[in-house]
Amino acid sequence: MTTAAPDEAEERVYAKVTWRLLPFLGACYLIAYLDRVNVGFAKLHMLTDLKMSEAAYGFGAGVFFVGYFLFEVPSNLALHRIGARFWIARIMVTWGLVSGSMAFTGTFAALTGLGADTVFYWLRFLLGIAEAGFFPGVLLYLNYWYPSHRQSRAVALLLAAQPLSFVIGAPISGAIMQGFGGTGGFTDWQWLFLLEAAPAIVLGIGVLFYLTNGIDDSAWLAEGDKRLLKDRLALEAKTKHDYSLRVLLSTKALWIFTAIYLLIVMGVYGINFWLPSIIQKTGVRSLLSIGWITAFSYLVSAVLAVVISRRAERRNEKRWHAAAAAAIGGTCLALSAAFSDSTWLTVAFVTLASAGGLVSMALFWSFPGSILMGAGVAAGLAAINSVGNLGGFFGPYLLGALTDWL
């Protein structure tokens, strides 16, 4: 009987961890992203029904990130203290309930006497609070399993759920709106919110039975596998620092990371919340066709993001790959506006812009985890994600205001 070389044994263990965690976490993130951005499809008819302006929609789409910003760090610290399994489950169930309640925006407006736009703002704000901590919580959870040099591939696979949420969700959203409108007295966009909220609640309950809080609790790992994983994390921990929150917030690197992430997010969410409308304005009228074109764009983005991220990891060079991806993405986003009369040229440039954003984002998240540990990485990841995600407020809001102005 031959014995595998240590590096081969190590690769097998990490492959086992990846196959156990990433498909499930990716599915959770896919649903999170779908519930966050399905408002882009609902917008196609919701604005007329609720008599809302483009600017009001842009503000409401973005105000999600204000709630997200305010509660992100407390949520991630709670996850670090309470445990990933329970806290991720809590996040998913509560955001599913709030997302489903978006269907009753008009009803709440009639009951409270508030304007529909005001109710829309509050529900989006509450959705941000409910979802706060999920993505950095999952990043923190990956830090419990992978040393930093292995994280970029795991994060790239996780982030592939972003475009895949559109690949899967866009045709489904189009089909729901085209097939369910008027059923049971609900409009097409109301059915969209109701049906797409249910998976978050189901998966949230599933988290309690599927995930463990860490390596030691994982019955699916042999004792030797657990020792190997813990040894690799302990070896890397010697080069990291567990900062107090006060020291962390005064660390220059934290705010550089945050500024970079904010700019990436502005472009990514500018695309995500407006792509169905961008496609519609090039002359496409069928909701199902808009869904399929959106799906095609994000499928190509997902493939490019994974391929380029793996190339960066193989070459052990992430900074220039991330910088080049962000620069190319920004350039293509600008070019998409110059060819807005052509559906396929617009989609081609937006696809490259989306891929650039995803690549830079995937590679970016391996940087903070390489210098922080413990509560420091929990607070640091949450701080970067929460402040950086304010770009998700500014991007959609500015696009909405510009659309009304133009």
Feature map (PLM): residue ranges:
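Glycine-rich segments within core transmembrane alpha-helices of 12-TM secondary carriers
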Residues: R153-G181, P199-A200, N385-G395
